[in-house]
């Protein structure tokens, strides 16, 4: 998580886990400026280092961003100019500009239960403009339970409510959305396997 930025931890990730077949992504990393005492420079350094690790290992990066769209966009663009890397914007609630920037460098956008919230109209309008072949669905458990389970402790089984809502938003069947997002998952997380 962006608010945890320990250099020693990153070295451990790089040296110990990247070659493990069960290690399928780098992150969650990124920028989180929600808290007043956010150490922005340390977060930026850590985020860039994680992108470098992701690029070198060819593992996707899971990007967390909160109240940091401009810096996230700048880092993603600058780092993509240094070389391609794969990844997704986790629990997307950001601006249309961030969605466009992420999509322009080939990242995926992951949608959580927030999309079902009554006050998420702006988010829904942004998500409608994201190509289906770039969308994933997530829970962000134990937080952000989708309607009709809002207020309860979130769990992976609740992702079906978010997926159903998203399918309706795109005017497709839940079955079709499930097929698309499953394909997207395996296209992004190439080390993942149905066998395990």
Segments from the language model and where they lie:
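Mid-to-C-terminal alpha-helical segments outside catalytic/metal-binding sites
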Residues: 53, 158-196
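Single conserved hydrophobic/aromatic residue that forms the stacking wall/gate
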Residues: 1-13
């Amino acid at each position: 998580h962006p608010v945890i930025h320990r250099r020693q931890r990153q070295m451990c990730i790089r040296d110990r886990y990247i070659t493990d077949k069960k290690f399928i992504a780098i992150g969650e990393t990124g920028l989180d400026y929600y808290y007043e005492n956010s150490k922005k420079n340390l977060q930026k350094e850590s985020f860039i280092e994680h992108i470098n690790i992701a690029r070198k290992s060819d593992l996707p990066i899971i990007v967390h961003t909160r109240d940091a769209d401009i810096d996230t966009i700048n880092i993603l663009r600058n780092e993509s100019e240094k070389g391609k890397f794969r990844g997704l914007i986790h629990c997307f609630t950001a601006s249309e500009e961030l969605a466009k920037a992420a999509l322009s460098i080939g990242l995926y956008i992951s949608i959580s239960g927030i999309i079902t919230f009554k006050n998420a109209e702006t988010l829904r309008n942004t998500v409608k403009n994201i190509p289906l072949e770039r969308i994933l669905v997530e829970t962000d458990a134990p937080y952000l339970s989708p309607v009709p389970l809002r207020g309860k402790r979130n769990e992976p089984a609740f992702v079906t409510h978010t997926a159903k809502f998203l399918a309706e938003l795109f005017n497709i069947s839940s079955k079709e959305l499930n097929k698309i997002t499953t394909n997207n998952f395996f296209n992004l997380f190439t080390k993942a396997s149905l066998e395990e």
